[in-house]
Amino acid sequence: MARSAAREAAMQLIYEHMMGGSGEETLGGMIEFVPDRDDARYIETVTEGVFAALHDVDRYIVAFAQDWAIDRLARVDLAILRLAAYELLCMEDIPAAVTINEAVELARKYSTEQSGAFINGVLGNLNRKLEREKDESRSGL
């Protein structure tokens, strides 16, 4: 399984959980059938991380969704944003450009072209804020 496929599976689990499904139970069953241990570990880490940090992840999404309340976002777009925002916030080993590009590709596949542009904007703004904060902490400001 390629990392893109693992990311797609993680997004689907997050979406399932949001729609009232048992994402956690499905996760356990899915992990058994993922042949690559790194991909299985990624899926488990990111889905559990999103569930555990949901309030913080959503706070960042709302901050950069410019006049969009979280309950007005399309559910699939929100699942993609939650996955990608978590990666940007907590998984520094994944390049931000990869995270953002993969999120846009997921939006194009599962949502609309407009969603891809919206997700790109939200994540791009979030990433710029995080980069500024890193620069400030390095310079001691």
What residues fall within each predicted segment?
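N-terminal interaction/assembly modules
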Residues: 1-141
